[in-house]
Amino acid sequence: MAKGKRTFQPNNRRRARVHGFRLRMRTRAGRAIVSARRRKGRDSLTA
């Protein structure tokens, strides 16, 4: 039985557009994510 293709095809532009800082800052929920990660002391806040 054949396996499907690998689903993770890395692409830096798509990564930034989907999970980036500017996108997170657009919504209230996104800002909450960033502030929670700041509070937790994460080295990396967003992708």
From Swiss-Prot:
GO CC aspect terms: ribonucleoprotein complex; ribosome
One Gene Ontology term from the biological process aspect of the record: translation
Keyword Ribonucleoprotein: yes
GO MF annotation list: structural constituent of ribosome
Keywords: Ribonucleoprotein, Ribosomal protein
Pfam families on file: Ribosomal_L34
Keyword match Ribosomal protein: yes
InterPro entries: Ribosomal_bL34, Ribosomal_bL34_CS
Segments traversing the membrane: none
PROSITE patterns xref list: RIBOSOMAL_L34
HAMAP family, sorted: Ribosomal_bL34
NCBIfam families in the cross-refs: rpmH_bact
Similarity field: Belongs to the bacterial ribosomal protein bL34 family.
Protein name per UniProt: Large ribosomal subunit protein bL34
GN (gene name): rpmH
